[in-house]
């Protein structure tokens, strides 16, 4: 069984403040292409991600979409109970919708947020229950995901644990590829 931890930027770190932002289309396109490459080589059974607004929720959406065509399951893990309680109503609704649709949902702590140990326990759980990681993350532009990135780097010194990055250069390439593909489709209709 091949399990992939996916994490990355929060939506606000990418200046994405609405569901219609074109950056979301490009990031989802990049994720979908990455996942399809693994799926077509029998290297992916589970996508395991968090519930943060941004890359993690977009990952769950793409995983659910691909799960209709491929033998792929999607899991959302959260570091503590009542994770989304402080979010606005729209974001809470999106969270609850994803929670209901994924193949597996759980919290690594049965308590509401108490202290940073819960976050470290969550990270350790993700490392120990996955075989590799993908981050939408650029080391030249650190964000909150730098903690995950640094922990994975440290973990790799003791364990074989592949980490792939989709950075801003990759996203620019994907945007150009997406635009070309959609222009071809437009003109061929």
Curated annotation (Swiss-Prot):
Highest taxon in the source lineage? Bacteria
Task: Fetch the InterPro entries from UniProt.
Answer: YspA
Family assignment from sequence similarity? Belongs to the UPF0398 family.
PANTHER family given in the database record: UPF0398 PROTEIN SPR0331, UPF0398 PROTEIN YPSA
Stored HAMAP family: UPF0398
Q: By its UniProt entry, which NCBIfam families does this protein fall under?
A: PRK13660.1 (NF010181)
Name of the protein this chain belongs to: UPF0398 protein lhv_1265
Q: Which organism is it from?
A: Lactobacillus helveticus (strain DPC 4571)
């Amino acid at each position: 069984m091949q399990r992939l931890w996916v994490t990355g930027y929060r939506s606000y770190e990418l200046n994405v403040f609405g569901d219609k932002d074109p950056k979301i289309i490009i990031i989802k396109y990049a994720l979908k292409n990455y996942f399809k490459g693994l799926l077509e080589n029998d290297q992916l059974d589970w996508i395991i991600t968090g519930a943060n607004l941004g890359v993690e929720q977009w990952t769950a959406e793409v995983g659910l979409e691909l799960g209709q065509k491929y033998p792929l399951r999607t899991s959302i893990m959260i570091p503590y109970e009542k994770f989304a309680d402080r979010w606005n109503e729209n974001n809470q609704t999106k969270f609850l919708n994803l929670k209901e649709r994924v193949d597996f949902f759980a919290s690594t702590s049965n308590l509401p947020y108490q202290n940073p140990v819960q976050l470290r326990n969550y990270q350790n759980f993700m490392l120990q229950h996955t075989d590799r990681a993908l981050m939408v993350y650029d080391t030249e532009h650190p964000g909150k995901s730098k903690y995950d990135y640094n922990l994975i780097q440290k973990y790799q010194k003791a364990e074989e644990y592949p980490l792939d990055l989709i950075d801003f250069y990759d996203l620019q390439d994907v945007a150009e590829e997406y635009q070309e593909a959609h222009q071809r489709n437009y003109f061929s209709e």
